[in-house]
UniProtKB/Swiss-Prot annotation:
Pathway info: Amino-acid biosynthesis; L-tryptophan biosynthesis; L-tryptophan from chorismate: step 3/5
Protein name: N-(5'-phosphoribosyl)anthranilate isomerase
EC number(s) reported in the record: 5.3.1.24
Xref: CDD domains: PRAI (cd00405)
InterPro entries in alphabetical order: Aldolase_TIM (IPR013785), PRAI_dom (IPR001240), RibuloseP-bd_barrel (IPR011060), TrpF_fam (IPR044643)
Record keywords: Amino-acid biosynthesis, Aromatic amino acid biosynthesis, Isomerase, Tryptophan biosynthesis
Source superkingdom: Bacteria
Any one GO BP annotation for this protein: L-tryptophan biosynthetic process
Catalytic activity, reaction form: N-(5-phospho-beta-D-ribosyl)anthranilate = 1-(2-carboxyphenylamino)-1-deoxy-D-ribulose 5-phosphate
Family: Belongs to the TrpF family.
Amino acid sequence: MPRIKICGIRTREEARWAAEAGADALGFIFAPHSKRYIQPETAREIILSLPPLISKVGVFAQASPEHVGRIVHECSLDTIQLHGNEDPRLYRHLSVTKIKAFSFPSAPAPGNSSAAAPDFSLVETSPSSSLPTSFRELPPASLHGILLDSSAGGRTGGTGIPLPWHTPEFQDFLHQVGDLGYPLILAGGLNPDNILEAIRLTRPYGVDVSSGVERNGRKDREKIQHFISQARKESPL
């Protein structure tokens, strides 16, 4: 069964719902442009109220290593998720687990674009030609996992639009990511109705959901419970 992260937590109530439903990790977004942005002091208060054995993930975009380090310390984060065009090597000195996010347009499918993306980018086209080389060159402690997310209309993450899991191009890219040896975390338009199919088609180490467990822009307790219940089911072969 994949590990489950509920992202975009903004209140103690939302955190409690996710913890009680069995989430493995909670995500706190420290990117100021995000509508799910949370002040570090608020995140710290929520984190201090959590039960043990839940991972605390800070989501950043284009933040300096110094800024990230301060929030890691202030909020007692154990994982950081980088959502910009950061070079993961700049954060290797931080004693936390590091996840690098890549975003793809939901249509056309990855691999259909003619342009390769720059290394370490949050991309608008498939990085299939540059990603493997870039990540094989990373030194130890620079990266511990890769997250795949969707983008649409210039927005990356939290779009509610699924990735094209079924397409041969996307499946080929998944194999390339798998060859790198990093755990794969799947995001992008996941919800209680499609999570089983997404797991069956991608076999991820973990899944990450935000908008898929929201109602009217806020986390919904029943949707969180339903999502986690579905994700915990044994996926069909």
